C-alpha cells in the first residue's frame, strides 16, 4: 500500500523522521496527562480542553482539495510547533487521545454543524458521566470561536433529538449539530445511545462543570467615589466575585 506523501520517503516507505515526530507527539501527550494526574475528572477534562486550545489553532488554509494528512491528525496538536495547526478532526482526536490515556469514557462522532468554526461536515466529542452523555466541541471552544465563553463543552442542548439534531446556546448564537448516517449506524438511535444528549447538568467527583468565563464590558466613575463595573453574564454562574489589585 502506498504511503501518503507527507509521511513518505518513497512510494512504499515511511519517512523515519516522521515516525520520530509521531513518537515525540505521543510523549508530549502523555506528559499532559501526567501533569493532571492528581486532579478530579472534571478538572482533567477542562484542563485537556484548555491545553489543546493553547497548543493549536484552527487551520483556515486547508481546503477540500488538500491531501488528507497532518491537519486532520493529533500529531499537529502535540508536536510542539506553533506553525502547525489542525481542523476539527485534529482537535477531536487530540481530546479523545488524552481521555483514553486517562481512562475517561469519551467518544468521537461526525456529522454536520451550522453556526461555528469549521461550519459544515464536522467532528466533535461526547463525554460520558454516570450513564449520561455531554457535548464536547473542542474546536468551537477555542479562543475566537463561538463557544470560547462556554456553551459547547460539557453543556446540555436547549432542544433537539438524535434524529433531528441538537441546538446549543452560546453567548453569541445558537449552534446546530446533526449526526451523520455513520454515527447513527455505529451508536444506534435509541435512548441508551451515546448520541442521546441529556438535560441534566454535568457533575462528577462532587464538582459541577464550571461556568463559562466572563469578561468586563464597561468601567465608569461618573459619580464621585462610585465605581460602576458591568460584565457579560456567564451561563450557569450562581454569582460573581470581583477582586481589585492594589499597587
Where are these regions (language model features)?
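Short beta-strand elements bearing conserved aromatic residues within extracellular beta-rich modules
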Residues: 240-244
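Intrinsically disordered, low-complexity N-terminal segments that are enriched in acidic
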Residues: 1-4
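Secondary-structure boundary elements
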Residues: 14-80
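Solvent-exposed strand-loop boundary residues in beta-sheet-rich modules
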Residues: 131, 246-247
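Loop/turn elements at helix/coil->beta-strand transitions in domains of secreted/extracellular proteins
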Residues: 40-46, 54, 83, 100-107, ...
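Low-complexity, Gly/Ser/Thr/Pro-rich intrinsically disordered linker/tail segments
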Residues: 147-212
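Pro/Thr/Ser/Gly-rich low-complexity, intrinsically disordered linker/stalk tracts
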Residues: 209-238
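Hydrophobic/aromatic-rich core segments of domains that either
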Residues: 90-169
